From Swiss-Prot:
The keyword RNA-binding applies. Coiled coil: none annotated. PANTHER family: 60S RIBOSOMAL PROTEIN L3-RELATED (PTHR11363), LARGE RIBOSOMAL SUBUNIT PROTEIN UL3 (PTHR11363:SF5). This is Large ribosomal subunit protein uL3. It comes from Methanococcus aeolicus (strain ATCC BAA-1280 / DSM 17508 / OCM 812 / Nankai-3). PROSITE patterns: RIBOSOMAL_L3 (PS00474). One of its GO terms (cellular component) is cytosolic large ribosomal subunit.
Length: 333
């Protein structure tokens, strides 16, 4: 980076305020445009990391047709349940919910999260009544953590946009999937580029050196035991502290999006990917799983939403050939 004359901080102000997320489930605020009628995202649970070798199928790479080492993240992908459909219109203030339809029946675990109707009825005709006003249709889905090794039964509920150009086709697809279970193979394929949206690991209350990367002061400051503080918090005038001054505070547990992660494999037999002794702080994988190249934000057990790539790269290379996936113990023995 080189030497800078003034370096008040290393961190970016673009991420301010650096406060805790409201809940450990991410909220997706923007969606890509797709012509295919299908869900544009899928929630999974992060299990852990390992490493793998794959044959590079990018012809532009200097390692083309060679075995390449890479760290990979393993995420368990149990089937999701389509609990309802919500239709949105548009006014001068933006999107506005027009109507919603709930399924005929629900999993009993969903009652741990919301109040279920006593006599559910999927009245899908409500979608046809406002079809001329609909600009976007989203599926109300919930996860099924009871099918995994997680010590929880309460599901997470999120909205996922249904892609497509023709509203009538989107409504027909929504009517078809309501009340059903979908697998990750209904949404993604191997070799595809995706975005990962999740809440990062929480670090708690930290000082300005760790939080903003300010310089540690030596000499008389360190002798007085104040070497890790902000040297100046502002001028005499204006007589207030600017919000840009690097201060101690919350680190981690923020919602972050990482773009263009590559799916190396989507598997059905989780036992083939579990290392000896299981994944640390997670255990074994019992359902479908996704192998993503590189790291993914968040600790083990946290829900990660895989979204269709919103900055979709022009070059697509298809599914690479995996030659080796490590299943050695991650417990250090």
């Amino acid at each position: 980076m080189g030497m800078k004359r003034n370096r008040p901080r290393r961190g970016s102000l673009a991420f301010s305020p650096r406060k805790r997320a409201k809940r450990p489930v991410p909220k997706i605020r923007s969606w890509p445009e797709r012509e295919t009628v299908k869900l544009l995202a899928f929630p999974v649970y992060k299990a852990g990391t390992t490493h793998a070798l794959y044959k590079e199928n990018n012809p532009k790479s200097p390692n083309a047709d060679q075995d390449v080492f890479t760290p990979v993240t393993v995420m368990e992908a149990p089937d999701i349940t389509i609990a309802g459909i919500r239709a949105y219109g548009k006014d001068t203030k933006g999107l506005k919910a027009l109507t919603e339809v709930w399924a005929d029946s629900f999993d009993k675990e969903l009652g741990r999260k919301i109040n279920l109707p006593k006599e559910p009825k999927a009245n899908t005709e409500k979608l046809d009544e406002v079809a001329d006003k609909i600009v976007e249709v989203r599926a109300i889905v919930h996860t099924n953590p009871k099918d995994t090794n997680l010590p929880k039964k309460k599901p997470e509920i999120i909205e996922i946009k249904i892609g497509g150009k023709n509203i009538s086709d989107i409504i027909a697809y929504a009517k078809d999937i309501i009340g059903k279970k979908l697998s990750i193979n209904d949404v993604f394929t191997g070799g595809e580029f995706i975005d990962t949206v999740a809440i990062t690991k929480g670090k708690g209350f930290q000082g300005p050196v760790k939080r903003w990367g300010i310089k540690i002061q030596f000499g008389k400051h360190q002798n007085k035991g104040v070497g890790r503080h902000t040297g100046s918090i502002g001028p005499w005038t204006p007589k207030r502290i600017m919000w840009t001054v690097p201060m101690a505070g919350q680190v981690g547990f923020h919602q972050r999006t990482e773009y263009n992660k590559r799916i190396l494999k989507i598997g059905e037999n989780g036992s083939e990917i579990v290392p000896k002794g299981g994944f640390l702080n997670y255990g074994v994988v019992k359902n479908n799983y996704v192998l993503v190249k590189g790291s993914v934000q968040g600790p083990a057990k946290r829900m990660v939403v895989l979204r269709e790539a919103i900055r979709n790269p022009e070059d697509k290379f298809g599914l690479p050939e995996l030659t080796y996936v490590s299943t050695e113990s991650k417990q250090g023995n």
